[in-house]
Amino acid sequence: MNPLRIRNFLLLSVWATACLTGFLLLWNYSFTPGETEEAPLKIPSHFQDGRFHLLMSIHPRCPCTKASLAELHRILAKTKGKMGVSILVYMPRGEQREWQNGALLNEAKSIPAVSIISDQDGKIAESLGMSTSGAVCLYDKDGNLRYSGGITASRGHEGDNHGKSIILSQVLGKTTGMEKGIVYGCPIQNNPTDS
């Protein structure tokens, strides 16, 4: 056999293996859900306003959050004021000034009729069972939990997904009951992007 052919075959094999390995690592990362905790069955009273209310927790340095905010925009366009929204923005204690600006935080602030709440050290999110950026809890008009989970199909990917469908169905009166979903995103606390 020709040594040049053997070398080319080996190079092609190494290249193909590297490409496949990279693809599998990316696939695994994209579809590995974040941690979830049990959300309270009743909304904290200071969030209740007589209509559906969605609470979302975000880490302003998590790149996955951009897709969650885009999906929130889509949900709000279809629910047309039938739901209040509060976004809990993780802020580490003593570093608020450095964290006050940023593309994701500015994007969250640009969403009309959404309340932005600075969540120092993620304590509010933690009390609501939200430990992953992009986690949401939907509560009905009576303050009962109707959905907890995420609103993206994988990390950082926009498009149709189970969580968004459930929220739309609940708010638009097509279904009732409580459902849970998967959250894809970065951890709210102890996030490697914090440093």
Predicted feature locations:
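Thiol-/selenol-based redox modules, centered on thioredoxin-like
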Residues: 146, 150-195
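Structural microenvironment flanking redox-active thiols in thiol-disulfide oxidoreductases
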Residues: 66-108, 123-127
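Alpha-helical transmembrane signal-anchor/signal-peptide segments
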Residues: 30-43
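Short active-site neighborhood of thiol/selenol oxidoreductases, capturing the structured segment around
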Residues: 46-72, 82, 86, 167
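Short, thiol/selenol-centered motifs that function as redox-active sites or metal-ligating centers
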Residues: 59-69, 93-97, 184-195
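Hydrophobic membrane-insertion alpha-helices, especially the h-region
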Residues: 8-27
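Short, Lys/Arg-rich N-terminal segment immediately upstream of the first membrane anchor
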Residues: 1-6
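Short, internal strand/loop/helix patches
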Residues: 104-139, 145-146
